[in-house]
């Protein structure tokens, strides 16, 4: 197995390797049969609930005072529906990613990710604009977002991160935008961080960059 390198200035060969590994993992994921993917997602959701229970037990935080950041899955990603619905059942506050652009920007290139709280009625009724259009970016003060309160990163109890590829050292690859890399630097050290993926997405070794934040990966 190749050694994992840590570079402050990644070489073009590392960039090419990361792209290659990302594409290979996405291909493996896309070839999974839907019933198989659904079963694995269900098992992962149960494990996430166990992790949440452990976190609440350690911190002493009551479910109604907890806030968990999740994501609205694309069809081939780990589906979190069972986990999310159980969070609502327990009275946990649930937050989802929303892409934000600066008011002076005329395009979606200059953007960042923040978390917004979504209530159960809006989630189940599919009335959330940034879940219906996850790639669209919004102004922070947009009227479309008024019903979904901003969540400070340091107030999160737990965050679940979608992972494209990972290795045994907990190095990971996302889709290449760096949104979670930037966001994870803002959260509290007490926040439980978990990346989720299928075992089919594991690769031998990912060349790490200095800004990368390794994540415990929950994979089935």
Q: How would you describe each model-predicted region?
A:
Residues 2-154:
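N-terminal active-site beta-alpha-beta segment that forms phosphate/nucleotide-binding
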Residues 103-220:
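Conserved phosphate- and dinucleotide-binding cores of soluble alpha/beta proteins
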């Amino acid at each position: 197995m190749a050694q994992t390198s840590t570079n402050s200035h990644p070489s073009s060969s590392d960039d090419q390797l990361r792209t290659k590994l990302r594409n290979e993992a996405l291909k493996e994921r896309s070839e999974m049969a839907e019933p198989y993917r659904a079963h694995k997602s269900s098992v992962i959701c149960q494990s996430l609930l166990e992790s949440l229970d452990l976190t609440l037990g350690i911190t002493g935080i009551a479910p109604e005072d907890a806030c968990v950041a999740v994501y609205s899955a694309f069809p081939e990603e780990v589906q979190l529906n069972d986990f999310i619905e159980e969070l609502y059942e327990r009275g946990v506050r649930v937050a989802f990613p929303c892409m934000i652009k600066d008011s002076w920007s005329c395009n979606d290139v200059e953007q960042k990710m923040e978390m917004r709280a979504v209530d159960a009625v809006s989630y189940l009724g599919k009335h959330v604009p940034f879940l219906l259009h996850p790639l669209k970016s919004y102004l922070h003060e947009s009227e479309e977002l008024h019903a979904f309160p901003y969540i400070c990163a340091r107030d999160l109890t737990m965050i679940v991160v979608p992972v494209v590829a990972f290795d045994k050292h907990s190095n990971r690859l996302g889709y290449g935008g760096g949104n979670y890399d930037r966001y994870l630097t803002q959260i509290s050290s007490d926040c439980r961080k978990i990346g989720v993926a299928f075992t089919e997405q594991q690769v031998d070794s990912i060349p790490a960059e200095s800004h990368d934040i390794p994540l415990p990966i929950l994979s089935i």
